Design a protein with these regions (language model features):
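Conserved "landmark" site that anchors the functional core of diverse proteins
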Residues: 1-5, 23-247
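Intrinsically disordered, low-complexity repeat/linker tracts enriched for polar/charged residues
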Residues: 5, 10, 15, 20, ...
Length: 247
């Protein structure tokens, strides 16, 4: 989900302002609360909105979820994009584009209609990951300090992906950028909790991976036969609860 097109924009003091709709790209008019974005049609059943940051993705996703019209099948956030899947028999691409533009401008209704309700989760974690000492060293703190900061953070599921049930967690309380492993592991055990960039996350199943592993959880992150297979969904909040912390 990443395409780059530059269209008729003016930059003043590093802020994109006074932008217009050109060649089907929805853009920001500089109004307070408005988001700068580009929109691309993805066939006849979806639109892709590109933003400039993860923070804008979270804002746009929340606005869309709070004002979802009939005909929207799914709203899928990612690191810099939001994909809106729709039924064109109920909601045309033109109408969907207008709705997304309204949400981006801050004009869309904040009254939830049939949006899903975000859930709060508390996940047990044992800080026994093989990379925890290395991560503490990289962040110039003690192992105990790393554990304390990770536990203190209130995490939000920004988006899901990579593997079914894998949630990319972000937090305003977490201000660290953790580099990925230089050599990814060919097999990461299910339940492994890791860090990469600004994200934390837990592996729902055994899979290759390059995140720095700091712990493990026994939480049922993905159950294929359940009504809702994935435990975590975008917008949910997560707190980690220490289990078996080594003193």
């Amino acid at each position: 989900m990443g395409r780059r097109h530059v269209v008729n924009r003016h930059v003043v003091n590093r802020h994109v302002v006074n932008r217009h709709v050109v060649n089907g790209h929805a853009v920001n008019d500089g109004s307070p609360g408005a988001l700068a974005l580009r929109m691309l049609p993805m066939g006849e059943h979806a639109l892709l909105a590109e933003t400039s940051s993860l923070e804008e993705v979270l804002t746009l996703h929340a606005r869309l979820e709070a004002s979802t019209p009939p005909g929207v099948i799914d709203i899928v956030p990612a690191a810099r994009t939001v994909l809106v899947q729709l039924d064109p028999r109920v909601l045309t691409l033109t109408a969907a584009r207008a709705w997304i533009e309204s949400a981006a401008s801050g004009e869309a209704s904040r009254t939830p209609q049939h949006a899903d309700v975000a859930r709060d989760h508390e996940l047990d974690i044992s800080y026994d990951g093989p990379d925890i000492a290395e991560v503490a060293h990289l962040l110039d703190m003690s192992r105990e300090g790393l554990i304390s900061r990770h536990l203190a953070a209130r995490w939000t599921v920004a988006f899901t992906g990579f593997a079914p049930g894998f949630g990319y967690l972000v937090s305003g309380d977490w201000h660290f950028d953790v580099p990925r492993r230089e050599s990814p592991r060919t097999s990461v055990p299910a339940g492994s909790v890791g860090l990469a960039g600004q994200f934390s996350g837990a592996y729902p199943r055994q899979t290759p991976g390059g995140w720095q592993l700091i712990g493990t959880t026994t939480a049922p992150l993905f159950e294929p036969l359940a009504t809702d297979p994935a435990l975590l969904a975008p917008g949910d909040t997560v707190r980690f609860r220490a289990k078996g912390v080594r003193q």
